[in-house]
């Protein structure tokens, strides 16, 4: 290190300089001293890294005071093999002892493999991707729940190990990190049963080429015409036409054949070649024709006597309808008033319950929400009471 030091005498003021004779001594010459000093030891260079913040990412405040970023909560599912250690973890969670003295910790060796320590035992674990997303909820009063996170990964503890580094001995493939099942029994092999496989690019290109070919043929055609045909209607029409042909042939055979009551063999031979459905349809059609002929033959003699009886019945029915209308209106009013009273009683009990929840709530947001519900239900209660007055018994 070089140190430079300059020492100079301050010149006198102007008045004294003018009073000094020209024959006086010359002004002094400044002296310069240079001192060199060797460094005591190597000096370390300090490098300070500052993260570049992207606008809009994280907690980006314009305040002058330094503020910490908000915490981002990330959750995974821990699955242990059944046994004493699994029950130990379950009881620790129920008693809220995790992180407060319970002998439980998790240490990740890499991005996918980890070590789970439970009650003095080590387990090898791997982090797998679930086939679906699971919502995690939390509650402060065991009444209202709030969504906390979306879970898409699970840490599976497989077997016990003696040392932490033993988990790195097993080589896993990329397919081992894709979990094929869900969390519940109905979601077993869900990736193969419910998720459709991705269509290859060759199939998509083949379909696009076929569409282009058909469009090119349409452009080269002199005239085109199209017609929309419903497949269900087409199948229905074909089945109706087939049944009509079968019934026509069957009825022609019935009319052209004489059946003797004493000779039952002729009847059995005729129906041997028919299906049960065709036979039932033919019998039903014959019965309909017979009943229609019978109604036509008996309707003519009764027509004259029924005209006078029908007029008397119509008059009696009109009188009964007028009486029933008055009774129906009274019954409807009573029924409506009963329903309104039941709704009012339920609404009053709900208002009391909400007011009690508002008094017991410690969170101001929940308390304001309960009070807003109370105000809404009070307004609805007043409206229902006016409806009860408008419909007296």
From Swiss-Prot:
Coiled-coil stretches: none
GO BP: any one term: RNA polymerase II preinitiation complex assembly
Biased composition (Basic and acidic residues): 292-305, 331-340
Lineage: superkingdom: Eukaryota
Entry keyword set: mRNA transport, Nucleus, Phosphoprotein, Transcription, Transcription regulation, Transport
GO cellular component, one term: transcription factor TFIID complex
Residue(s) carrying Phosphoserine: 308, 310
GO MF terms, alphabetically ordered: RNA polymerase II general transcription initiation factor activity
Cell compartment(s), UniProt: Nucleus
Biased composition (Acidic residues): 308-330
Matches recorded under Pfam families: TAFII55_N
Residue numbers spanned by region Disordered: 1-43, 253-273, 290-340
Family affiliation: Belongs to the TAF7 family.
Matches recorded under PANTHER family: TATA-BOX BINDING PROTEIN ASSOCIATED FACTOR 7 (PTHR12228:SF0), TRANSCRIPTION INITIATION FACTOR TFIID 55 KD SUBUNIT-RELATED (PTHR12228)
Function (record text): TAFs are components of the transcription factor IID (TFIID) complex that are essential for mediating regulation of RNA polymerase transcription. Also involved in the transport of mRNA from the nucleus to the cytoplasm.
Subunit structure of this chain's protein: TFIID is composed of TATA binding protein (TBP) and a number of TBP-associated factors (TAFs).
The protein's name in its UniProt record: Transcription initiation factor TFIID subunit 7
Source organism (scientific name): Schizosaccharomyces pombe (strain 972 / ATCC 24843)
């Amino acid at each position: 290190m070089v140190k430079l030091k300059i020492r100079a005498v301050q010149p006198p003021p102007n008045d004294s300089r003018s009073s000094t004779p020209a024959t006086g001594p010359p002004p002094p010459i400044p002296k310069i001293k240079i001192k060199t000093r060797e460094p005591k030891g190597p000096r370390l260079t300090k490098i300070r890294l500052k993260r570049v913040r992207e606008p809009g990412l994280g907690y980006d405040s314009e305040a002058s005071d330094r503020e910490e970023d908000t915490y981002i909560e990330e959750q995974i599912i821990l699955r242990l093999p059944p046994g004493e250690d699994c029950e130990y973890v379950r009881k620790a969670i129920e008693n809220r002892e995790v992180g407060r003295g319970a002998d439980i910790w998790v240490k990740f060796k890499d991005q996918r493999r980890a070590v789970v320590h439970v009650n003095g035992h080590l387990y090898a674990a791997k982090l797998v991707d679930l086939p679906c997303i699971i919502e995690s909820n939390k509650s402060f009063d065991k009444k209202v729940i709030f969504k906390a996170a979306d879970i898409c990964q699970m840490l599976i503890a497989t077997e016990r190990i003696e040392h932490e580094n033993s988990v790195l001995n097993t080589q896993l493939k990329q397919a081992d990190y894709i979990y094929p099942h869900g969390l519940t029994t109905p979601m077993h092999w869900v990736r193969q049963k419910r998720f459709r496989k991705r269509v290859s690019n060759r199939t998509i290109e083949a379909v696009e080429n076929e569409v282009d070919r058909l469009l090119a043929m349409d452009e080269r055609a002199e005239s085109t015409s199209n017609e929309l045909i419903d497949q269900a209607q087409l199948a229905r029409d074909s089945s109706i036409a087939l049944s009509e042909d079968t019934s026509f042939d069957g009825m022609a055979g019935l009319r052209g054949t004489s059946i003797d009551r004493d000779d039952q063999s002729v009847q059995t031979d005729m129906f041997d070649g028919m299906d049960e459905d065709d036979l039932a349809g033919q019998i039903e059609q014959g019965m309909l024709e017979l009943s229609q002929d019978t109604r036509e033959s008996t309707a003519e003699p009764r027509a004259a006597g029924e005209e006078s009886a029908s007029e008397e019945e119509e008059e009696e029915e009109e009188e009964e309808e007028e009486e029933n209308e008055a009774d129906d209106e009274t019954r409807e009013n009573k029924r409506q008033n009963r329903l309104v009273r039941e709704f009012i009683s339920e609404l009053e009990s709900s208002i009391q319950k909400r007011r009690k929840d508002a008094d017991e709530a410690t969170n101001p947001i929940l308390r304001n929400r309960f009070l807003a519900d109370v105000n809404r239900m009070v307004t609805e209660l007043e409206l229902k009471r006016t409806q009860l007055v408008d419909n007296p018994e």
